[in-house]
Amino acid sequence: MILDGKAVSEKRLELLKEEIEESGLYPRLATVIVGEDPASQMYVRMKHRACERVGIGSIGIELPADASTEQVLEAVARLNNDPDINGILVQLPLPGGVDTTRVIDAVAPEKDVDGFHPCSLGRLFSGTPVFAPCTPQGIMTILDEYRIPIRGKRAVVVGRSIDVGRPMAALLLNADATVTICHSKTENLEDEMRRADILVSAIGKAKFVGPEMVKEGATVIDVGINQDEQGKLCGDVDFDAVKDRAGAITPVPGGVGPMTIATLMENTFRAAKLRTCGNNTVR
């Protein structure tokens, strides 16, 4: 079975558009991008287009590649203090001269729709998330939409990044899976992967996951965005080789990526609702 993230995202965005229209709210998202990296610019444009589609206002702050950490922090502070802005997204990665940790920590928790602030992650790891990071939460939505069982299943997450691997593991744990996180220092990696009922790969290595690493009938979630030797977009998973062995699998493109943006829109609307009702549970 192909887990069609694009189809799920289309459904979620249409439902969100209706919900926003019925709410009478006008959520607003601000993006901050530093430099002119083509991939980052493309991702930001996609996010603004999604905002327009569902009825979320958006503004973009563009800073030069040589911007200092202090300049980025000043931009974030202005957005924190703007009562008309509900969500703030700092497009990553930031240039090497900018302290990414300081910038992420500076975003007001109640506007942290990307889910990377320590307050957001702390709530996630404690089992009471408000804003979960968009990619892992989008994956959970795909699993839910396709009714993939999680409770009691063995889940293996390959990759321990703070934006995908660790929060993915936390969400699966919160859903009562038995979770293992693997990384570059894991011994007998293939053995660990073969035990997985749900296998999530987020390591950024083109076609790294082959059929010999996948349990028959497993659900395989491919978070990777890479290029193969021919320059063609591909994931961490060798899709053609694995699809017949897996019980369910996300493609690249069209799998996890669209759900990341849909979840960002949902988080932004949630931030607007929380502000309207005066809910301060984010902190």
From Swiss-Prot:
Binding, NADP(+): 159-161, 184, 225
Keyword Oxidoreductase: yes
Stored SUPFAM superfamilies: Aminoacid dehydrogenase-like, N-terminal domain, NAD(P)-binding Rossmann-fold domains
Entries under PANTHER family matching the protein: C-1-TETRAHYDROFOLATE SYNTHASE, CYTOPLASMIC (PTHR48099:SF5), C-1-TETRAHYDROFOLATE SYNTHASE, CYTOPLASMIC-RELATED (PTHR48099)
CC annotations in GO: cytosol
InterPro entries linked: Aminoacid_DH-like_N_sf (IPR046346), NAD(P)-bd_dom_sf (IPR036291), THF_DH/CycHdrlase (IPR000672), THF_DH/CycHdrlase_cat_dom (IPR020630), THF_DH/CycHdrlase_CS (IPR020867), THF_DH/CycHdrlase_NAD-bd_dom (IPR020631)
EC number: 1.5.1.5, 3.5.4.9
This protein's name: Bifunctional protein FolD
Pfam families for the chain: THF_DHG_CYH (PF00763), THF_DHG_CYH_C (PF02882)
Protein role: Catalyzes the oxidation of 5,10-methylenetetrahydrofolate to 5,10-methenyltetrahydrofolate and then the hydrolysis of 5,10-methenyltetrahydrofolate to 10-formyltetrahydrofolate.
Family: Belongs to the tetrahydrofolate dehydrogenase/cyclohydrolase family.
Record text on subunit structure and interactions: Homodimer.
CDD domains per UniProt: NAD_bind_m-THF_DH_Cyclohyd
Pathway the protein takes part in: One-carbon metabolism; tetrahydrofolate interconversion
Keywords assigned: Amino-acid biosynthesis, Histidine biosynthesis, Hydrolase, Methionine biosynthesis, Multifunctional enzyme, NADP, One-carbon metabolism, Oxidoreductase, Purine biosynthesis
Gene Ontology molecular functions: methenyltetrahydrofolate cyclohydrolase activity; methylenetetrahydrofolate dehydrogenase (NADP+) activity
Stretches of the chain forming a coiled coil according to its record: none
GO BP, one annotated term: tetrahydrofolate interconversion
Annotated catalysed reactions: (6R)-5,10-methylene-5,6,7,8-tetrahydrofolate + NADP(+) = (6R)-5,10-methenyltetrahydrofolate + NADPH; (6R)-5,10-methenyltetrahydrofolate + H2O = (6R)-10-formyltetrahydrofolate + H(+)
